[in-house]
From Swiss-Prot:
PANTHER family: NICOTINATE-NUCLEOTIDE ADENYLYLTRANSFERASE-RELATED (PTHR39321), PHOSPHOPANTETHEINE ADENYLYLTRANSFERASE (PTHR39321:SF3)
Taxonomic path: Bacteria, Pseudomonadati, Spirochaetota, Spirochaetia, Leptospirales
Natural source organism: Leptospira interrogans serogroup Icterohaemorrhagiae serovar copenhageni (strain Fiocruz L1-130)
Gene: nadD
HAMAP family noted in UniProt: NaMN_adenylyltr (MF_00244)
A GO molecular-function descriptor: nicotinate-nucleotide adenylyltransferase activity
Metabolic or biological pathway: Cofactor biosynthesis; NAD(+) biosynthesis; deamido-NAD(+) from nicotinate D-ribonucleotide: step 1/1
Tagged with keyword Plastid: no
Name used for this protein in its record: Probable nicotinate-nucleotide adenylyltransferase
Reaction equation(s) it catalyzes: nicotinate beta-D-ribonucleotide + ATP + H(+) = deamido-NAD(+) + diphosphate
Length: 199
């Protein structure tokens, strides 16, 4: 590999960040030791999912608390939060390549996004902009292979632990006045202190 810094891109709502996200990052750093840094990029609005609940400043503060527990280099970028309207991965990748011309990027996506990758804006262009796409497990012990996608590009599959939690589930628990598990104490304390996800 040349002198370019290999950097991961990990996007999502992170509303709130939880132990599932933590295990994905741990597995990624373990399985991809050449990667020296991950950019965690919260989106303002995913075009294929429901609109977010929390304010951008709350998301960023929760993420700062979340990544403070890692020894590896993880940087939070707010470029998608600053956009109006939906966030598109192709825009983000191209913007990052302009800002960081000496880096090579790999993308982390969930198995659900892998299944729907053909629905992403300019998905074929994304394949030309990153080195590799790593798919993490969310629900399946073994991610069903998309033969067509894998004939076009190298998708690699992480062996991350399956953590039965989503940000949507956590928000529902808070709305029902239940304090959920699978969320770090720092993030939980922040949520309770600031009355996020309360009725």
């Amino acid at each position: 590999m040349n002198s370019s810094i290999l950097t991961g891109i990990f996007g999502g709502s992170f509303d709130p960040p939880h132990e599932g996200h933590s295990e994905i990052l741990k597995s990624f750093f373990l399985e991809v030791p050449d990667c020296k840094e991950v950019f965690v990029i919260p989106n303002r609005q995913n075009p294929l999912k429901e609109e977010k609940i929390s304010l951008s400043e709350n998301i960023l503060e929760m993420l700062n608390l979340f990544v403070s527990e890692f020894s590896q280099s993880i940087r939070i970028l707010d470029l998608e939060l600053k956009r109006s309207g939906p966030s598109y991965t192709i825009q983000t990748i191209q913007e990052l390549k302009t800002i960081y011309p000496n880096r090579k990027f790999v993308l982390l996506i969930g198995e659900d996004n892998y299944s729907n990758f053909h629905k992403w804006k300019d998905w074929e262009k994304i394949l030309t902009e990153v080195e590799t796409i790593f798919v993490f497990r969310r629900f399946s012990k073994e991610v069903p292979l998309n033969s067509h996608l894998n004939s076009l590009f190298e998708f690699k599959f992480l062996e991350n632990p399956l953590i039965p939690v989503t940000s949507t589930d956590l928000r529902k628990s808070f709305f029902q006045s239940k304090v959920p598990n699978l969320i770090s104490k720092k993030v939980l304390d922040y949520i309770l202190k600031n009355k996020l996800y309360s009725k």
